[in-house]
A protein has these predicted regions:
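Loop-helix junctions at membrane interfaces
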Residues: 1-187
């Protein structure tokens, strides 16, 4: 599923120079079902496909690679790997305190998308915030930090609810199905 999303327009919805990513959804689903290690592996796949996009026609990514390939690597790969791992850690921690065993799925879905945006934009600003390219994207002339906050608001308004509802709902359904399957196999 992740490779289909990564190599079709479904995974990265372009809005101006940046992209809204739906790739967080399978990562958080996997982190909830497979745990932190599985989330990290799926996050790594997300990061690698994101880094690949920089060489495959994504104008924003191509500009970043042209400025500094190593920093582009840092923006794409460790951030997504960390998001996947932490989504699994958060799910396990919330599972221990959630009496309903349902809220945990939706909160983890929401936080996975939040962490993706937070880690990506923070690393982007640290590595490239001083560059003329990012400075020129700030058409208002206001503080670049405020530009990043505005982008995060737009990005979060789209990614977080989708990851919460779709990621949480699918992970809950898969978890229930796996438990039923395990119970059937034990009989």
């Amino acid at each position: 599923i992740m490779l289909i999303l990564a190599f079709t327009p479904l995974g990265y919805l372009r809005i101006g120079p940046l992209a809204i990513s739906l790739m967080t959804i399978p990562v958080v689903i996997g982190a909830m079902i497979l745990g932190p290690a599985g989330g990290a592996v799926l996050g790594l796949v997300f990061g690698l496909t994101s880094f690949y996009q920089c060489f495959a026609g994504d104008p924003f990514g191509a500009a970043l690679v042209a400025m500094n390939p190593f920093f582009t690597f840092l923006v794409c790969i460790p951030t997504r790997t960390l998001m996947g791992w932490l989504s699994g850690v958060i799910f396990k921690a919330l599972w221990k305190i959630d009496k309903t065993k349902t809220v945990t799925y939706f909160v983890t879905g929401l936080l996975g998308a939040f962490m993706n945006t937070l880690f990506f934009m923070s690393t982007l600003m640290i590595c490239f915030g001083h560059t003329e390219y990012l400075q020129s994207m700030n058409a208002t002339g206001a503080n670049l930090f405020m530009f990043a906050v505005a982008f995060c608001g737009i990005n979060g308004a789209l990614e977080m609810p989708m990851s919460c509802v779709v990621g949480g709902g699918v992970a809950k359904a898969v978890s229930v199905a796996l438990k039923k399957n395990a119970a059937t196999e034990e009989k």
